[in-house]
């Protein structure tokens, strides 16, 4: 079905990177896959970490979209960060920090409620619809 891992755990600075995410179509943009990401973020914050990071190949549009769907803020691209299969790889960075968690948690809880799914696997309100206003505020420095 799928796998996701914590990578680059930095206890000193309080950051954890999530990565090596490989979901089959059975989990992609589905309630169960989203809940797994929610639980990983929740664990990280509840255990005193301050920063939840997501990095991906800048050409991987599905991964970039997934990060933003989950409410992670786009932080930029590290150009020529590595060489992959003989080519330069640019790495896109996304993150959520502890101060944002209460807002993101509300989005996840609302999204994951049974009432949001009714009798269908498809949500009534998508997670993107819920996190989009949060990302807008983050990108416009409206959170202190």
Please report, for each region that a protein language model flagged, where it lies by residue:
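Conserved catalytic-core motifs of GNAT/GCN5-like acyltransferases
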Residues: 73-87
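A conserved beta-strand-loop-helix scaffold within acyl/acetyltransferase catalytic domains
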Residues: 1-15, 21-25
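Conserved beta-strand segments that form the floor/walls of ligand-binding pockets within enzyme
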Residues: 17, 22, 53-55, 93
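Catalytic-site neighborhood detector that most strongly recognizes the C-terminal catalytic loop/helix
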Residues: 88, 93-102
